[in-house]
């Protein structure tokens, strides 16, 4: 598709943005579908199928929790309330059952997607308050929240996790500082802004010191930190680090 449209109809530099919007519109058209084997192959359906029905079919035939979650997120993000009313109970039933399982990771993610499903049904029927409390109780006692965050691929759900940690734990600045060692760098700016807002300057300086000291162990995080410090994106009076040490560590890392 890209080869056929560029540059006659779409500029090369604008392709990604244009195709993202076009792909969503095509998915919502009941007369067209995307091949599961070839990502950008579009076919005409013999019988119209709504996008909601297609997502439910993919959801139902998948054995993977993570894939089911991806289909559910796509459902929430792209399906209007009226179209989704007849389909959403299947999603809700599955994730409600997952809330009863032994996997804390699945429980946290199931709560988050069920919370988003509230746009289709009466929130009280989902018993979200009770589900949230179950998640909060787990987060209050967990020592592996950095590992949990690594298992969450959705940026919005990572953000939800950060917010729940902040609301649930007195030591949240320390807990969130551990999440800053996660790669790739995605939720980090949001976490850092929250730490700055709460004046957790010693936590931030401690994080920077650990990154410089452990640059070999955290090369991607070191590059992110160094770029922000050297470009003065982070330009605060309370920052306490050695610029010389930062530069020397960077040179050593590049020469290894």
Please name every model-derived segment.
Residues 1:
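Non-catalytic nucleic-acid-binding interfaces of large nucleic-acid enzymes and RNP effectors
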Residues 4-14:
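Short helix-coil junctions and helix-kink-helix linkers
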Residues 13, 17, 39, 66, ...:
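OB-fold/S1-family RNA-binding modules
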Residues 20-57:
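Charged low-complexity interaction tracts in eukaryotic proteins
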Residues 53-63, 208, 212-217:
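Amphipathic alpha-helical assembly segments used for oligomerization, scaffolding, or translocation
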Residues 55-84:
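Leucine-rich, amphipathic alpha-helical/linker segments
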Residues 88-97, 117-256:
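Non-catalytic all-alpha helical scaffold/repeat segments
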Residues 101-102:
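Flexible helix-coil transition and linker loops at the boundaries of alpha-helical arrays
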